[in-house]
Protein backbone atom coordinates (compact mmCIF):
# COMPACT_ATOMS: atom_id res chain seq x y z
CA UNK A 1 0.00 0.00 0.00
CA UNK A 2 2.97 2.28 0.25
CA UNK A 3 3.55 2.50 -3.48
CA UNK A 4 0.18 4.15 -4.33
CA UNK A 5 0.69 6.55 -1.44
CA UNK A 6 4.12 7.50 -2.76
CA UNK A 7 2.67 7.96 -6.22
CA UNK A 8 -0.11 10.12 -4.86
CA UNK A 9 2.36 12.23 -2.90
CA UNK A 10 4.56 12.62 -5.96
CA UNK A 11 1.61 13.65 -8.11
CA UNK A 12 0.46 16.08 -5.45
CA UNK A 13 3.94 17.59 -5.28
CA UNK A 14 4.10 17.94 -9.07
CA UNK A 15 0.65 19.55 -9.21
CA UNK A 16 1.62 21.91 -6.41
CA UNK A 17 4.78 22.89 -8.26
CA UNK A 18 2.86 23.43 -11.51
CA UNK A 19 0.20 25.44 -9.67
CA UNK A 20 2.86 27.56 -7.99
CA UNK A 21 4.61 28.15 -11.30
CA UNK A 22 1.33 29.01 -13.02
CA UNK A 23 0.25 31.31 -10.19
CA UNK A 24 3.56 33.11 -10.15
CA UNK A 25 3.55 33.55 -13.92
CA UNK A 26 0.05 35.06 -13.71
CA UNK A 27 1.55 37.92 -11.73
CA UNK A 28 3.77 38.96 -14.65
CA UNK A 29 2.52 42.08 -16.42
CA UNK A 30 3.97 44.02 -19.33
CA UNK A 31 3.45 47.61 -20.45
CA UNK A 32 4.44 48.82 -23.91
CA UNK A 33 5.06 52.56 -24.34
CA UNK A 34 4.49 53.65 -27.92
CA UNK A 35 6.03 57.08 -27.33
CA UNK A 36 9.48 55.64 -26.55
CA UNK A 37 9.31 52.22 -28.28
CA UNK A 38 9.98 50.39 -25.02
CA UNK A 39 8.31 47.80 -22.80
CA UNK A 40 8.56 47.05 -19.09
CA UNK A 41 7.97 43.53 -17.73
CA UNK A 42 6.91 43.59 -14.07
CA UNK A 43 5.98 41.13 -11.33
CA UNK A 44 9.37 39.55 -10.68
CA UNK A 45 11.01 39.04 -7.28
CA UNK A 46 14.69 39.53 -6.50
CA UNK A 47 17.46 37.16 -5.42
CA UNK A 48 20.55 39.37 -5.44
CA UNK A 49 23.95 37.96 -4.61
CA UNK A 50 25.67 40.29 -2.16
CA UNK A 51 28.45 38.02 -0.87
CA UNK A 52 30.10 34.61 -0.95
CA UNK A 53 30.13 31.61 1.37
CA UNK A 54 33.25 29.43 1.15
CA UNK A 55 33.60 25.84 2.26
CA UNK A 56 36.47 23.36 2.03
CA UNK A 57 35.74 19.97 0.46
CA UNK A 58 38.15 17.07 0.96
CA UNK A 59 38.76 13.65 -0.55
CA UNK A 60 41.10 11.28 1.28
CA UNK A 61 43.54 9.48 -1.01
CA UNK A 62 45.57 6.32 -0.69
CA UNK A 63 49.34 6.01 -0.83
CA UNK A 64 49.60 3.04 -3.15
CA UNK A 65 53.09 1.70 -2.59
CA UNK A 66 52.96 -1.70 -4.21
CA UNK A 67 50.81 -3.80 -6.46
CA UNK A 68 51.88 -7.43 -6.28
CA UNK A 69 49.09 -8.88 -8.30
CA UNK A 70 49.99 -10.02 -11.80
CA UNK A 71 47.01 -12.27 -12.37
CA UNK A 72 45.27 -12.70 -15.69
CA UNK A 73 41.74 -12.72 -14.33
CA UNK A 74 39.52 -10.27 -16.25
CA UNK A 75 38.19 -8.70 -13.07
CA UNK A 76 41.71 -8.24 -11.72
CA UNK A 77 42.75 -6.56 -14.96
CA UNK A 78 39.84 -4.15 -14.64
CA UNK A 79 40.88 -3.32 -11.09
CA UNK A 80 44.47 -2.71 -12.18
CA UNK A 81 43.25 -0.44 -14.99
CA UNK A 82 41.23 1.56 -12.49
CA UNK A 83 44.25 1.82 -10.20
CA UNK A 84 46.32 3.16 -13.10
CA UNK A 85 43.63 5.76 -13.82
CA UNK A 86 43.61 6.66 -10.15
CA UNK A 87 47.40 7.16 -10.12
CA UNK A 88 47.30 9.29 -13.27
CA UNK A 89 44.55 11.45 -11.80
CA UNK A 90 46.52 12.12 -8.63
CA UNK A 91 49.63 12.97 -10.66
CA UNK A 92 47.59 15.36 -12.79
CA UNK A 93 46.27 17.06 -9.66
CA UNK A 94 49.81 17.40 -8.30
CA UNK A 95 50.94 19.13 -11.47
CA UNK A 96 47.83 21.28 -11.60
CA UNK A 97 48.38 22.43 -8.02
CA UNK A 98 51.64 24.11 -9.05
CA UNK A 99 49.84 26.44 -11.45
CA UNK A 100 46.86 27.50 -9.36
CA UNK A 101 46.86 31.08 -8.01
CA UNK A 102 46.79 29.84 -4.43
CA UNK A 103 50.18 28.18 -4.79
CA UNK A 104 53.21 29.97 -3.39
CA UNK A 105 56.90 29.10 -3.45
CA UNK A 106 56.75 27.41 -0.09
CA UNK A 107 53.93 25.14 -1.17
CA UNK A 108 55.82 24.21 -4.33
CA UNK A 109 58.87 23.21 -2.29
CA UNK A 110 56.58 21.01 -0.19
CA UNK A 111 54.96 19.32 -3.19
CA UNK A 112 53.77 15.93 -1.89
CA UNK A 113 55.81 12.92 -2.90
CA UNK A 114 53.71 10.28 -1.15
CA UNK A 115 52.75 8.52 -4.39
CA UNK A 116 55.38 6.01 -5.59
CA UNK A 117 54.95 6.61 -9.28
CA UNK A 118 56.11 9.23 -11.76
CA UNK A 119 55.39 10.31 -15.28
CA UNK A 120 57.84 9.73 -18.07
CA UNK A 121 60.37 12.55 -18.26
CA UNK A 122 58.91 13.95 -15.05
CA UNK A 123 61.10 17.01 -14.75
CA UNK A 124 60.60 18.35 -18.25
CA UNK A 125 56.94 17.38 -18.32
CA UNK A 126 56.21 19.12 -15.05
CA UNK A 127 57.76 22.35 -16.23
CA UNK A 128 55.99 22.27 -19.59
CA UNK A 129 52.57 21.41 -18.20
CA UNK A 130 52.95 23.95 -15.43
CA UNK A 131 53.72 26.79 -17.84
CA UNK A 132 50.82 25.86 -20.11
CA UNK A 133 48.40 25.75 -17.22
CA UNK A 134 49.64 29.06 -15.87
CA UNK A 135 48.88 30.78 -19.15
CA UNK A 136 45.49 29.10 -19.36
CA UNK A 137 44.65 29.99 -15.79
CA UNK A 138 45.54 33.65 -16.28
CA UNK A 139 43.21 33.82 -19.24
CA UNK A 140 40.40 32.20 -17.28
CA UNK A 141 41.03 34.43 -14.27
CA UNK A 142 40.58 37.54 -16.41
CA UNK A 143 37.17 36.19 -17.36
CA UNK A 144 35.88 35.66 -13.83
CA UNK A 145 37.45 38.88 -12.50
CA UNK A 146 37.28 39.31 -8.75
CA UNK A 147 34.44 36.82 -8.33
CA UNK A 148 36.69 34.11 -6.92
CA UNK A 149 38.75 36.39 -4.68
CA UNK A 150 37.29 35.06 -1.42
CA UNK A 151 37.74 31.45 -2.52
CA UNK A 152 41.34 32.12 -3.55
CA UNK A 153 42.02 33.71 -0.16
CA UNK A 154 40.84 30.57 1.67
CA UNK A 155 42.68 28.36 -0.78
CA UNK A 156 45.96 30.17 -0.14
CA UNK A 157 45.68 29.62 3.60
CA UNK A 158 45.45 25.86 3.04
CA UNK A 159 48.98 25.94 1.64
CA UNK A 160 50.40 27.12 4.94
CA UNK A 161 52.17 24.64 7.20
CA UNK A 162 49.83 22.50 9.27
CA UNK A 163 46.54 23.64 7.75
CA UNK A 164 45.80 20.41 5.90
CA UNK A 165 46.66 18.32 8.96
CA UNK A 166 44.34 20.52 11.01
CA UNK A 167 41.48 19.76 8.63
CA UNK A 168 42.41 16.09 8.41
CA UNK A 169 42.38 15.75 12.20
CA UNK A 170 39.02 17.51 12.48
CA UNK A 171 37.49 15.01 10.03
CA UNK A 172 38.83 11.85 11.64
CA UNK A 173 35.59 10.86 13.34
CA UNK A 174 33.10 12.88 11.30
CA UNK A 175 32.44 13.91 7.72
CA UNK A 176 31.79 17.55 8.56
CA UNK A 177 33.49 20.01 10.93
CA UNK A 178 34.12 23.73 11.40
CA UNK A 179 37.86 24.48 11.34
CA UNK A 180 39.52 27.74 12.37
CA UNK A 181 42.31 28.54 9.92
CA UNK A 182 45.47 30.39 10.84
CA UNK A 183 44.15 33.63 9.33
CA UNK A 184 41.34 33.66 11.90
CA UNK A 185 38.62 32.60 9.47
CA UNK A 186 36.43 29.64 10.38
CA UNK A 187 35.30 27.46 7.49
CA UNK A 188 33.01 24.48 7.22
CA UNK A 189 34.97 21.47 5.95
CA UNK A 190 33.40 18.32 4.54
CA UNK A 191 34.82 14.93 3.60
CA UNK A 192 32.80 13.76 0.61
CA UNK A 193 34.84 10.71 -0.40
CA UNK A 194 37.18 8.41 1.53
CA UNK A 195 39.19 6.55 -1.09
CA UNK A 196 41.99 5.87 1.39
CA UNK A 197 40.07 3.51 3.64
CA UNK A 198 38.40 1.80 0.72
CA UNK A 199 41.60 1.22 -1.26
CA UNK A 200 43.85 0.36 1.68
CA UNK A 201 41.46 -1.81 3.69
CA UNK A 202 39.14 -3.33 1.11
CA UNK A 203 40.62 -3.23 -2.38
CA UNK A 204 44.39 -3.73 -2.08
CA UNK A 205 44.17 -6.68 0.33
CA UNK A 206 42.18 -8.48 -2.37
CA UNK A 207 44.28 -7.66 -5.42
CA UNK A 208 47.59 -8.20 -3.60
CA UNK A 209 46.74 -11.76 -2.65
CA UNK A 210 48.97 -14.31 -4.31
CA UNK A 211 45.93 -15.95 -5.84
CA UNK A 212 44.88 -12.63 -7.39
CA UNK A 213 41.30 -13.79 -7.47
CA UNK A 214 38.22 -11.59 -7.14
CA UNK A 215 35.12 -13.58 -6.39
CA UNK A 216 32.54 -11.20 -7.87
CA UNK A 217 32.23 -8.30 -10.26
CA UNK A 218 30.61 -6.08 -7.62
CA UNK A 219 34.04 -5.22 -6.22
CA UNK A 220 35.13 -3.93 -9.62
CA UNK A 221 31.93 -1.94 -10.11
CA UNK A 222 32.14 -0.41 -6.64
CA UNK A 223 35.69 0.79 -7.18
CA UNK A 224 34.84 2.14 -10.63
CA UNK A 225 31.99 4.17 -9.17
CA UNK A 226 34.09 5.57 -6.36
CA UNK A 227 37.06 6.22 -8.62
CA UNK A 228 34.90 7.84 -11.29
CA UNK A 229 34.18 10.83 -9.06
CA UNK A 230 37.88 11.52 -8.56
CA UNK A 231 38.54 11.11 -12.29
CA UNK A 232 35.77 13.54 -13.22
CA UNK A 233 36.90 16.11 -10.65
CA UNK A 234 40.44 15.85 -12.04
CA UNK A 235 39.19 16.24 -15.59
CA UNK A 236 37.12 19.33 -14.73
CA UNK A 237 39.96 21.03 -12.88
CA UNK A 238 42.42 20.18 -15.66
CA UNK A 239 40.21 21.41 -18.49
CA UNK A 240 39.25 24.60 -16.62
CA UNK A 241 42.69 25.41 -15.20
CA UNK A 242 41.77 24.85 -11.59
CA UNK A 243 38.56 26.92 -11.43
CA UNK A 244 35.20 25.57 -12.54
CA UNK A 245 31.74 27.04 -12.81
CA UNK A 246 29.03 25.90 -12.54
CA UNK A 247 29.71 23.48 -9.70
CA UNK A 248 29.00 20.00 -11.03
CA UNK A 249 27.45 17.07 -9.19
CA UNK A 250 30.92 15.51 -9.07
CA UNK A 251 32.25 18.44 -7.05
CA UNK A 252 29.16 18.38 -4.83
CA UNK A 253 26.26 15.98 -5.11
CA UNK A 254 22.76 17.36 -4.65
CA UNK A 255 22.49 15.92 -1.15
CA UNK A 256 25.89 17.38 -0.21
CA UNK A 257 24.91 20.77 -1.62
CA UNK A 258 21.59 20.80 0.23
CA UNK A 259 23.38 19.82 3.43
CA UNK A 260 25.87 22.63 2.92
CA UNK A 261 23.07 25.15 2.29
CA UNK A 262 21.36 24.02 5.48
CA UNK A 263 24.57 24.74 7.44
CA UNK A 264 25.03 28.23 6.00
CA UNK A 265 24.57 31.18 8.41
CA UNK A 266 21.53 32.59 6.59
CA UNK A 267 17.81 32.96 7.27
CA UNK A 268 15.32 30.17 6.69
CA UNK A 269 13.83 32.12 3.77
CA UNK A 270 17.24 32.30 2.13
CA UNK A 271 17.84 28.58 2.72
CA UNK A 272 14.45 27.78 1.22
CA UNK A 273 15.18 29.97 -1.78
CA UNK A 274 18.53 28.26 -2.44
CA UNK A 275 17.19 24.75 -1.81
CA UNK A 276 14.34 25.30 -4.28
CA UNK A 277 16.69 26.63 -6.94
CA UNK A 278 19.67 24.29 -6.73
CA UNK A 279 20.50 24.53 -10.45
CA UNK A 280 20.70 28.32 -10.33
CA UNK A 281 22.88 28.10 -7.21
CA UNK A 282 25.22 25.74 -9.07
CA UNK A 283 25.43 28.11 -12.04
CA UNK A 284 26.48 31.00 -9.81
CA UNK A 285 28.99 28.99 -7.74
CA UNK A 286 32.69 28.16 -8.20
CA UNK A 287 34.95 25.28 -7.26
CA UNK A 288 38.64 26.12 -6.87
CA UNK A 289 41.49 23.61 -6.83
CA UNK A 290 43.56 24.19 -3.70
CA UNK A 291 46.03 21.53 -2.59
CA UNK A 292 46.86 17.83 -2.63
CA UNK A 293 48.93 17.01 0.44
CA UNK A 294 49.11 14.56 3.36
CA UNK A 295 46.98 12.09 1.38
CA UNK A 296 44.23 14.69 1.12
CA UNK A 297 42.81 16.49 -1.90
CA UNK A 298 41.26 19.78 -0.79
CA UNK A 299 39.31 22.20 -2.96
CA UNK A 300 37.20 25.23 -2.13
CA UNK A 301 33.54 25.54 -3.08
CA UNK A 302 32.29 29.12 -3.21
CA UNK A 303 28.51 29.53 -2.96
CA UNK A 304 26.49 32.73 -3.48
CA UNK A 305 24.93 34.56 -0.55
CA UNK A 306 21.62 36.15 -1.57
CA UNK A 307 21.44 39.11 0.80
CA UNK A 308 18.52 40.79 -0.98
CA UNK A 309 15.44 38.69 -1.70
CA UNK A 310 11.76 39.25 -2.49
CA UNK A 311 12.06 42.92 -3.55
CA UNK A 312 10.30 43.97 -6.80
CA UNK A 313 12.21 43.54 -10.06
CA UNK A 314 11.38 44.57 -13.61
CA UNK A 315 12.98 44.30 -17.02
CA UNK A 316 13.16 47.08 -19.60
CA UNK A 317 13.15 46.18 -23.30
CA UNK A 318 13.95 48.85 -25.92
CA UNK A 319 14.00 49.06 -29.70
CA UNK A 320 14.88 51.82 -32.23
CA UNK A 321 12.29 54.57 -32.70
CA UNK A 322 12.62 56.35 -36.06
CA UNK A 323 10.71 58.81 -38.20
CA UNK A 324 8.95 57.33 -41.21
CA UNK A 325 9.62 59.74 -44.05
CA UNK A 326 9.30 58.18 -47.47
CA UNK A 327 12.49 59.83 -48.70
CA UNK A 328 15.34 57.40 -48.12
CA UNK A 329 18.11 58.67 -45.85
CA UNK A 330 16.03 61.48 -44.38
CA UNK A 331 14.95 59.69 -41.19
CA UNK A 332 16.30 60.15 -37.68
CA UNK A 333 16.28 57.54 -34.89
CA UNK A 334 16.35 57.45 -31.11
CA UNK A 335 16.78 54.42 -28.84
CA UNK A 336 16.63 54.13 -25.07
CA UNK A 337 19.91 52.67 -23.79
CA UNK A 338 18.77 51.90 -20.25
CA UNK A 339 17.53 48.39 -21.08
CA UNK A 340 18.23 45.62 -18.58
CA UNK A 341 17.08 44.32 -15.20
CA UNK A 342 16.13 46.59 -12.30
CA UNK A 343 15.57 45.56 -8.68
CA UNK A 344 14.69 47.61 -5.62
CA UNK A 345 17.53 47.50 -3.12
CA UNK A 346 17.57 49.39 0.21
CA UNK A 347 15.84 52.56 -1.00
CA UNK A 348 17.65 52.70 -4.34
CA UNK A 349 17.61 50.61 -7.48
CA UNK A 350 20.19 48.03 -8.58
CA UNK A 351 20.51 48.19 -12.38
CA UNK A 352 21.93 45.26 -14.35
CA UNK A 353 22.65 46.52 -17.89
CA UNK A 354 23.74 43.07 -19.09
CA UNK A 355 20.43 41.28 -18.73
CA UNK A 356 21.93 37.93 -19.72
CA UNK A 357 24.03 37.88 -16.52
CA UNK A 358 20.82 37.43 -14.53
CA UNK A 359 19.14 34.03 -14.35
CA UNK A 360 15.35 33.79 -14.30
CA UNK A 361 13.48 30.92 -12.69
CA UNK A 362 9.70 31.33 -12.93
CA UNK A 363 9.19 34.84 -11.51
CA UNK A 364 12.47 34.86 -9.55
CA UNK A 365 15.45 36.87 -10.83
CA UNK A 366 18.92 35.80 -9.68
CA UNK A 367 21.48 38.57 -10.23
CA UNK A 368 24.99 39.36 -9.02
CA UNK A 369 25.40 42.83 -7.50
CA UNK A 370 28.99 42.81 -8.75
CA UNK A 371 27.48 43.41 -12.22
CA UNK A 372 25.15 46.20 -11.10
CA UNK A 373 24.97 49.98 -10.96
CA UNK A 374 23.18 51.78 -8.13
CA UNK A 375 20.58 54.29 -9.36
CA UNK A 376 18.02 56.51 -7.61
CA UNK A 377 14.43 55.33 -7.52
CA UNK A 378 13.49 58.21 -9.88
CA UNK A 379 14.86 56.13 -12.75
CA UNK A 380 11.33 54.68 -12.99
CA UNK A 381 10.09 58.03 -14.28
CA UNK A 382 11.78 57.37 -17.63
CA UNK A 383 9.12 54.80 -18.43
CA UNK A 384 6.17 57.16 -18.09
CA UNK A 385 7.82 60.52 -18.93
CA UNK A 386 11.19 60.45 -20.64
CA UNK A 387 11.41 64.26 -20.42
CA UNK A 388 10.88 64.34 -16.65
CA UNK A 389 13.06 66.88 -14.77
CA UNK A 390 14.01 64.56 -11.90
CA UNK A 391 16.07 61.96 -13.79
CA UNK A 392 18.04 62.39 -17.01
CA UNK A 393 17.05 59.42 -19.15
CA UNK A 394 19.65 57.69 -21.32
CA UNK A 395 19.33 57.44 -25.09
CA UNK A 396 21.35 57.02 -28.27
CA UNK A 397 20.74 58.67 -31.64
CA UNK A 398 21.40 57.82 -35.26
CA UNK A 399 20.21 58.46 -38.78
CA UNK A 400 20.05 54.79 -39.77
CA UNK A 401 16.59 53.25 -39.61
CA UNK A 402 17.34 49.53 -39.25
CA UNK A 403 14.39 47.17 -38.84
CA UNK A 404 14.50 44.70 -35.95
CA UNK A 405 12.47 42.98 -33.26
CA UNK A 406 12.99 42.58 -29.50
CA UNK A 407 11.39 39.60 -27.79
CA UNK A 408 9.92 40.56 -24.43
CA UNK A 409 8.52 38.48 -21.58
CA UNK A 410 4.95 38.55 -22.94
CA UNK A 411 5.33 39.53 -26.60
CA UNK A 412 7.56 41.40 -29.03
CA UNK A 413 8.48 44.97 -29.98
CA UNK A 414 8.75 45.42 -33.74
CA UNK A 415 10.68 48.30 -35.32
CA UNK A 416 9.77 48.20 -39.00
CA UNK A 417 11.19 50.76 -41.44
CA UNK A 418 11.78 51.29 -45.13
CA UNK A 419 10.71 48.52 -47.45
CA UNK A 420 11.19 45.74 -44.88
CA UNK A 421 8.23 43.40 -44.48
CA UNK A 422 7.30 42.74 -40.85
CA UNK A 423 4.65 40.21 -39.79
CA UNK A 424 3.33 38.25 -36.81
CA UNK A 425 2.22 34.66 -37.36
CA UNK A 426 0.32 31.85 -35.72
CA UNK A 427 1.54 28.32 -36.39
CA UNK A 428 -1.97 27.21 -37.36
CA UNK A 429 -3.41 30.33 -39.03
CA UNK A 430 -0.32 31.77 -40.70
CA UNK A 431 0.22 35.54 -40.87
CA UNK A 432 -2.23 37.29 -38.57
CA UNK A 433 -0.74 40.79 -38.58
CA UNK A 434 1.37 42.92 -40.92
CA UNK A 435 3.18 45.84 -39.31
CA UNK A 436 3.29 49.25 -40.92
CA UNK A 437 6.34 51.52 -40.75
CA UNK A 438 7.16 52.62 -37.23
CA UNK A 439 7.44 51.01 -33.81
CA UNK A 440 4.72 48.61 -32.71
CA UNK A 441 4.07 45.83 -30.21
CA UNK A 442 2.30 42.48 -30.27
CA UNK A 443 1.47 40.27 -27.28
CA UNK A 444 2.14 36.54 -27.30
CA UNK A 445 -1.56 35.69 -27.17
CA UNK A 446 -2.24 33.81 -30.40
CA UNK A 447 1.21 34.73 -31.76
CA UNK A 448 4.01 32.19 -32.15
CA UNK A 449 6.56 33.98 -34.33
CA UNK A 450 7.50 37.44 -35.52
CA UNK A 451 9.22 37.94 -38.86
CA UNK A 452 11.30 41.01 -39.76
CA UNK A 453 12.65 40.71 -43.27
CA UNK A 454 14.36 37.32 -43.45
CA UNK A 455 14.76 37.00 -39.67
CA UNK A 456 12.35 34.87 -37.67
CA UNK A 457 11.81 35.41 -33.93
CA UNK A 458 10.02 33.00 -31.58
CA UNK A 459 8.00 34.73 -28.86
CA UNK A 460 7.97 33.57 -25.24
CA UNK A 461 4.88 31.66 -24.19
CA UNK A 462 4.82 32.91 -20.62
CA UNK A 463 1.41 33.75 -19.22
CA UNK A 464 0.58 37.27 -18.13
CA UNK A 465 -1.24 40.49 -18.91
CA UNK A 466 -0.07 42.99 -21.55
CA UNK A 467 -0.96 46.68 -21.74
CA UNK A 468 -0.46 48.94 -24.79
CA UNK A 469 0.15 52.57 -23.72
CA UNK A 470 -0.42 54.82 -26.73
CA UNK A 471 1.43 58.09 -27.25
CA UNK A 472 2.99 60.33 -29.87
CA UNK A 473 6.46 58.99 -30.79
CA UNK A 474 8.90 61.45 -29.23
CA UNK A 475 11.14 61.29 -32.29
CA UNK A 476 8.50 63.36 -34.11
CA UNK A 477 9.22 66.25 -31.74
CA UNK A 478 12.70 66.71 -33.19
CA UNK A 479 13.77 68.64 -36.30
CA UNK A 480 15.90 66.42 -38.57
CA UNK A 481 17.99 69.47 -39.58
CA UNK A 482 19.35 69.98 -36.06
CA UNK A 483 19.03 66.43 -34.66
CA UNK A 484 22.47 65.13 -33.53
CA UNK A 485 23.41 61.77 -35.00
CA UNK A 486 25.63 58.96 -33.66
CA UNK A 487 25.35 59.88 -29.98
CA UNK A 488 25.96 56.44 -28.46
CA UNK A 489 26.08 57.29 -24.76
CA UNK A 490 24.00 60.38 -24.22
CA UNK A 491 20.99 61.58 -22.29
CA UNK A 492 17.89 63.56 -23.11
CA UNK A 493 19.39 66.77 -21.68
CA UNK A 494 22.63 66.32 -23.64
CA UNK A 495 20.76 65.78 -26.89
CA UNK A 496 18.54 68.79 -26.22
CA UNK A 497 21.61 70.88 -25.38
CA UNK A 498 23.23 69.96 -28.68
CA UNK A 499 20.00 70.81 -30.47
CA UNK A 500 19.91 74.20 -28.71
CA UNK A 501 23.54 74.78 -29.67
CA UNK A 502 22.69 74.00 -33.28
CA UNK A 503 19.69 76.34 -33.16
CA UNK A 504 21.84 79.09 -31.58
CA UNK A 505 24.42 78.61 -34.31
CA UNK A 506 21.72 78.90 -36.96
CA UNK A 507 20.36 82.08 -35.34
CA UNK A 508 23.84 83.58 -35.20
CA UNK A 509 24.39 82.70 -38.82
CA UNK A 510 21.09 84.34 -39.74
CA UNK A 511 22.08 87.48 -37.84
CA UNK A 512 25.43 87.65 -39.57
CA UNK A 513 23.78 87.08 -42.91
CA UNK A 514 21.21 89.75 -42.11
CA UNK A 515 23.96 92.22 -41.16
CA UNK A 516 25.86 91.47 -44.33
CA UNK A 517 22.72 91.91 -46.40
CA UNK A 518 21.91 95.11 -44.54
CA UNK A 519 25.39 96.48 -45.29
CA UNK A 520 25.04 95.54 -48.89
CA UNK A 521 21.64 97.29 -49.05
CA UNK A 522 23.08 100.53 -47.57
CA UNK A 523 25.92 100.54 -50.07
CA UNK A 524 23.52 99.94 -52.92
CA UNK A 525 21.30 102.79 -51.75
CA UNK A 526 24.27 105.18 -51.55
CA UNK A 527 25.49 104.22 -54.99
CA UNK A 528 21.99 104.55 -56.38
CA UNK A 529 21.60 107.95 -54.72
CA UNK A 530 24.90 109.18 -56.13
CA UNK A 531 23.99 107.96 -59.58
CA UNK A 532 20.61 109.64 -59.32
CA UNK A 533 22.23 112.89 -58.14
CA UNK A 534 24.71 112.76 -61.00
CA UNK A 535 21.93 112.07 -63.45
CA UNK A 536 19.90 114.95 -61.98
CA UNK A 537 22.90 117.28 -62.25
CA UNK A 538 23.57 116.19 -65.81
CA UNK A 539 19.96 116.62 -66.73
CA UNK A 540 19.94 120.05 -65.07
CA UNK A 541 23.01 121.11 -67.03
CA UNK A 542 21.50 119.85 -70.24
CA UNK A 543 18.27 121.67 -69.46
CA UNK A 544 20.10 124.97 -68.76
CA UNK A 545 22.10 124.57 -71.95
CA UNK A 546 19.01 123.92 -73.99
CA UNK A 547 17.28 126.86 -72.37
CA UNK A 548 20.12 129.22 -73.23
CA UNK A 549 20.31 127.86 -76.71
CA UNK A 550 16.62 128.27 -77.32
CA UNK A 551 16.70 131.80 -75.91
CA UNK A 552 19.58 132.70 -78.15
CA UNK A 553 17.73 131.48 -81.21
CA UNK A 554 14.59 133.42 -80.44
CA UNK A 555 16.35 136.96 -80.17
CA UNK A 556 16.34 139.12 -83.63
CA UNK A 557 19.65 140.56 -85.12
CA UNK A 558 19.83 144.47 -85.54
CA UNK A 559 22.50 146.18 -87.79
CA UNK A 560 23.76 149.71 -87.22
CA UNK A 561 23.81 152.43 -89.92
CA UNK A 562 27.50 152.13 -90.36
CA UNK A 563 27.20 148.41 -90.90
CA UNK A 564 24.51 148.96 -93.47
CA UNK A 565 26.43 151.67 -95.30
CA UNK A 566 29.43 149.39 -95.23
CA UNK A 567 27.52 146.67 -96.81
CA UNK A 568 26.16 148.95 -99.39
CA UNK A 569 29.54 150.35 -100.12
CA UNK A 570 30.91 146.93 -100.48
CA UNK A 571 28.12 145.95 -102.76
CA UNK A 572 28.55 148.95 -104.96
CA UNK A 573 32.26 148.86 -104.97
CA UNK A 574 32.28 145.96 -107.28
From Swiss-Prot:
Lipid positions (S-palmitoyl cysteine): 550
Keywords: Cleavage on pair of basic residues, Coiled coil, Disulfide bond, Fusion of virus membrane with host cell membrane, Fusion of virus membrane with host membrane, Glycoprotein, Host cell membrane, Host Golgi apparatus, Host membrane, Host-virus interaction, Lipoprotein, Membrane, Palmitate, Signal, Syncytium formation induced by viral infection, Transmembrane, Transmembrane helix, Viral attachment to host cell, Viral attachment to host entry receptor, Viral envelope protein, Viral penetration into host cytoplasm, Virion, Virus entry into host cell
GO cellular component: host cell Golgi membrane; host cell plasma membrane; membrane; viral envelope; virion membrane
Record GO biological process: entry receptor-mediated virion attachment to host cell; fusion of virus membrane with host plasma membrane; symbiont entry into host cell; symbiont-mediated induction of syncytium formation
Glycosylation sites: 27, 70, 116, 120, 126, 500
Transmembrane segments: 525-550
UniProt feature coiled coil, ranges: 76-96, 153-209, 481-516
Protein name: Fusion glycoprotein F0
Source organism per UniProt: Human respiratory syncytial virus A (strain RSS-2)
